[in-house]
Regions:
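Short acidic-glycine-tyrosine-enriched beta hairpin
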Residues: 62, 103-120
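Glycine- and acidic-residue-biased ligand/ion/polar-headgroup-sensing regions
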Residues: 75-78, 85-103
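Double-stranded beta-helix
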Residues: 33-36, 45, 124-155
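Short beta-strand His + acidic residue motifs that chelate non-heme Fe in jelly-roll/DSBH
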Residues: 80-82, 100-101, 117, 122-129
């Protein structure tokens, strides 16, 4: 198993400004902290125009400004070619099977699997055919997807 367990580096660049505007209701707890309780039916999914079929739900934070937590839904068979992200991110596969290619090696991650990428680690991201994929993504800075122009990944 590859030590650099791959993070789902999903693709959502410019469409984030509209997604980030979704406000989430926070409820103060008796001890002064914050609780966010969001039933699945209340989650607002937004299309990501740059990547047809991809949807994103901002749960906390603002992807255009800094650290944030999102859900990302990829259609079955989706592929994001070789790319990297500037910020570190940590993710869990909630449904579907994600397929990452890192350093020329392909790794399949079924539901319940974890992956992370530190800034600028190149990879290819796929959602296996047959079932849409959903990941929970914790990003430690602004979100971007930087294509690796002219570089082909080893398959």
């Amino acid at each position: 198993m590859n030590k650099a367990v791959v993070v789902f580096a999903l693709v959502v660049v410019a469409g984030l400004s509209t997604i980030a505007s979704q406000a989430r209701a926070a409820e103060k707890s008796k001890k002064g902290g914050t609780a966010i309780l969001m039933p699945a039916g209340d989650i607002k999914w937004t299309d990501v125009p740059q990547f047809p079929g991809v949807k994103m739900a901002v749960l906390q934070g603002d992807p255009d400004k800094g650290a944030h937590h999102t859900l990302i839904k990829l259609p079955a068979g989706f592929t994001a070619p070789l790319h990297h992200h500037t910020s570190d991110h940590y993710a869990t596969v909630l449904s579907g099977t994600m397929v990452f290619t890192v350093d020329g090696k392909e790794q399949r991650l079924p539901p319940g699997s974890y992956f992370s990428f530190t800034g600028k680690k190149t990879h290819i991201t796929k959602c296996d055919a047959g079932t849409d994929c959903v990941i929970s993504n914790d990003v430690r800075g602004k979100w971007d997807v930087v294509p690796e122009e002219g570089k082909a990944a080893k398959m």
